[in-house]
UniProtKB/Swiss-Prot annotation:
Protein's name according to its UniProt entry: Serine protease HtrA-like
Subcellular location field: Cell membrane
Membrane-related topology note: Single-pass membrane protein
GO cellular component terms, semicolon-separated: plasma membrane
UniProt-annotated stretches for the region Disordered: 1-184
Organism: Staphylococcus epidermidis (strain ATCC 35984 / DSM 28319 / BCRC 17069 / CCUG 31568 / BM 3577 / RP62A)
GO terms (BP aspect): proteolysis
EC annotation from Swiss-Prot or TrEMBL: 3.4.21.-
Length: 585
């Protein structure tokens, strides 16, 4: 075989065989059914067309009959009116006839003869006209001959001829009028047919247009979806940019001071600042916090004027602000300062009361609120003097972040917690110098005194204030006694959580008890001894409140400083549960 020659495969080897025809019974049956259905549809349409034509003809027939009826009614009305006119004319002629009664029989006879002779030519003429004009002229001839035979007077004959002539003329034109009516009805029929034909053509055009629209959407629906998607996207973008513009406008109006809430906050701050003073236990001229001195020797904070008697003002502040100094420097107004005196303080509640004499009438007591009505997330303002008098009257805004917090406090700075402080949590910025400052609600009422904050590198916005109801009760004790006398059960206690297994086994403490305080020693004749408490007892509940540790125990006991009532203690003694009454006075 020659390699240069192209190899060709015979067509008989690779040609595709012709497909055999398969008889599709279902398809032929479907086509036959469709054909029969189309024929039936055509027959129905043809039948409906005939029915419509019959209805049109019937309607035209009815319309024609109705029209003829109306014409007959009008004809009768015209005849009636004409007869009435004829009757009136006859009455008038009768009156004139009475006036002519004086004429003799002779003249009347002459008139009759003359009328007879005059009617003969007319009679001949009417007979001649009978051959030309037919029935209509014959009737007129009979009437004329009858009048001549009766021999009526000339006036009466003329009147009868007048009354007969219009009636004859009306009937003489009735036949052309019917022809005109037929032509009119035929024209109306043709006009209605044209209207129906036009209506059918319009319906056909509408259907064809609908079919074209449907075919267009079927063919181009992907493109239509893309176009609709683009339009929706543009509308969404427009709505987004419109909202952004509205927000920008709102922010602009807020900065312009048009918002009602900001105006209210401004008024509250303006009034409340006058009741907040600076309290400093260092009487030197430098009123700025110094890093070179010990914090306990140079503590600076804020105070709130809550009462004014004469020229003396009473100030709420913190015990850690006044420290151990009895004299305090009180700065108010435009850097005016006086020396105040600490009349009472309580380290357990971190509260102190300072009294000073101020003659300035602008210094007014702040309105007291009710801390029992504080709500979570309630907006508040914090007013104080952070970092000293250089930033006095600072106002920060926030909300109430938490209620009924029990915050452990290290009072003596020995890295051990000494007490639990009852407070509510705020998120407003609190800095050194804000201690003792005011927490006011949206109505400008004092609801708390700033006490402390959590100062850790990974904690922000956690400050605490003493509820004003507790502050007022303790301040009352401090005003009268200079201190708060707390009840003391005179027992030494240890946390159950700090016990090891041997100590738990020694007192037969059940395994389920993992909280409370263990009594180590009981002072003789003390409140605990009188109540029946013994060494080795474990107090797990006091006054219906769960005791977790010694801080909670002290807080529950100290909360009864004002009433000193008898409370119930739930204890475990040698593994057995027992209730004991403790008198706090």
């Amino acid at each position: 075989m020659d390699n240069n020659k192209k190899q060709v495969i015979p067509r008989s080897q690779y040609r595709r065989k012709r497909r055999e025809y398969f008889h599709n019974v279902e398809r032929e049956e479907r086509i036959r059914r469709e054909k029969i259905e189309k024929e039936n549809q055509a027959k129905r349409e043809q039948h409906q067309t005939k029915v419509n034509e019959e209805r049109v003809k019937d309607n035209l027939r009815k319309a024609r009959i109705e029209k003829l009826t109306q014409e007959e009614i009008h004809q009768q009305r015209d005849d009636k009116s004409y007869k009435q006119k004829t009757l009136n004319q006859n009455n008038q002629m009768n009156k004139s006839k009475d006036d002519d009664n004086k004429i003799g029989e002779e003249s009347l006879h002459d008139v009759r003869v003359s009328s007879d002779t005059s009617t003969l030519p007319h009679q001949n003429k009417s007979i001649k006209d009978y051959d030309d004009s037919g029935n209509e002229s014959k009737q007129h001839t009979k009437l004329t001959s009858k009048e001549s035979m009766l021999g009526v007077n000339s006036n009466h004959t003329e009147q009868d001829s007048r009354s007969t002539q219009p009636y004859s003329s009306k009937h003489s034109y009735s036949q052309p009028k019917d022809k005109d009516n037929d032509n009119t009805q035929q024209a109306q029929f043709l006009k209605k047919e044209d209207k129906q034909r036009n209506r059918a053509e319009n319906i056909k055009k509408v259907n064809e247009f609908k079919q074209l629209v449907v075919a267009f959407f079927k063919e181009h629906w992907p493109k239509m979806l893309i176009i609709i998607g683009i339009i929706v996207l543009l509308l969404i973008l427009n709505a987004i940019f419109t909202t952004v513009n509205k927000n920008d406008h709102t922010n602009d109006s807020a900065f312009n001071g048009t918002a009602k809430d900001e105006t209210t906050a401004m008024k509250i701050a303006e009034n409340s600042v006058k009741s907040v003073v600076t309290v400093e236990n260092d009487l030197s001229n430098d009123t700025t916090v110094s890093d070179n001195k010990n914090e306990s020797d140079n503590e600076i904070g804020s105070g709130v004027v809550y009462k004014k008697v004469g020229d003396s003002i009473y100030i709420f502040t913190n015990a850690h602000v006044v420290g151990d100094q009895e004299k305090q420097k009180v700065t108010y107004g435009n850097d005016k300062s006086v020396t105040g005196k600490v009349i009472g303080k309580d380290k357990w509640s971190d509260l102190a009361v300072v009294k000073a004499k101020v003659a300035d009438e602008n210094i007014k007591p702040m309105t007291m609120g009710d801390s029992n009505n504080i709500k979570l997330a309630e907006p508040i303002l914090v007013i104080g003097n952070p970092l000293g008098t250089d930033f006095k009257g600072s106002v920060s805004q926030g909300i109430v972040s938490g209620l009924n917090r029990h915050v452990p406090v290290d009072i003596d700075k020995n890295d051990n917690y000494d007490a639990l402080m009852k407070a509510f949590q705020i998120d407003a910025p609190v800095n050194p110098g804000n201690s003792g400052g005011a927490v006011v609600d949206r109505d400008g009422r004092l609801i708390g005194i700033v006490s402390l904050k959590i100062d850790m590198h990974n904690v922000e916005g956690m400050a605490f204030a003493i509820p004003i109801n507790d502050v007022r009760k303790i301040a009352k004790e401090l005003e009268h006694k200079g201190k708060v006398n707390y009840p003391n059960t005179e027992i030494k206690i240890k946390n159950v959580g700090d016990l090891d297994d041997s100590e738990r086994n020694a007192i037969n403490l059940p395994a389920k008890v993992n909280h409370g305080v263990l009594i180590g020693e009981v002072k003789e004749n003390g409140l605990g001894d009188k109540a029946g408490l013994k060494k080795g007892d474990v107090i797990v509940e006091l006054d219906g409140k769960k005791i977790e540790d010694n801080l909670r125990y002290r807080q529950v006991i100290y909360s009864h400083y004002d009433d000193q009532k008898t409370i119930t203690a739930k204890i475990y003694r040698n593994g057995a549960e027992k209730n004991i009454k403790i008198k706090l006075k």
